[in-house]
Amino acid sequence: MARHIRLCGLAALLAVGLLISAQASRAADAGLVTKSSNHPAKETIERFENAVKSKGWVVFTEIDHAAAAKQVGLDMKPRTVILFGNPKIGTAPMQKAATLAIDNPPKALVWEDDDGKVWLTYNSGEYIGTQVYPRHGLSMPPEVVKNLGQLLTDLADQATR
């Protein structure tokens, strides 16, 4: 009986592991990059915004979903979206395709899970270049996709490490 219980427990752990792995895989396939942060949510947001500014880019705004939920009497763990970009780079594509403005500027999400762990999630450069831009009839040269991906990685690393 004890062996049966151990086997059931092991099977349950394996199933949970597979579900988590599948969820992470789906997120990666959908162009999302998620990095764990070594800092509380508020500090991760501040570090991300400082990293954006250090690259000469602009932080346009924050959307604090937890604060909005609180205003209507609901509780939510931290969920803050940061809109950031570089008008020198982003304006021309939006002039060519007005609908790009629904997806631009890029966004980062700082969020806390049920265990209190903080994460930073953003669209990969590859996703932006191969999915977002073509969705609006635009193309992004492979070198620009690569450079954007590296920039986003650098920003995320500066915020989370």
Task: Annotate each predicted stretch with a short phrase.
Residues 27-58, 157-161:
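Terminal, regulation- and interaction-focused segments at domain boundaries
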Residues 1-5:
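N-terminal secretory signal peptides that target proteins for export/translocation
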Residues 126-161:
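C-terminal partner/receptor-binding element of secreted or periplasmic proteins
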Residues 9-21:
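Bacterial N-terminal signal peptides
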Residues 49, 53, 57-60, 64-106, ...:
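Compact, glycine-rich, soluble single-domain proteins
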Residues 108-138:
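Beta-strand/loop substructures that line and gate deep hydrophobic ligand-binding cavities in soluble
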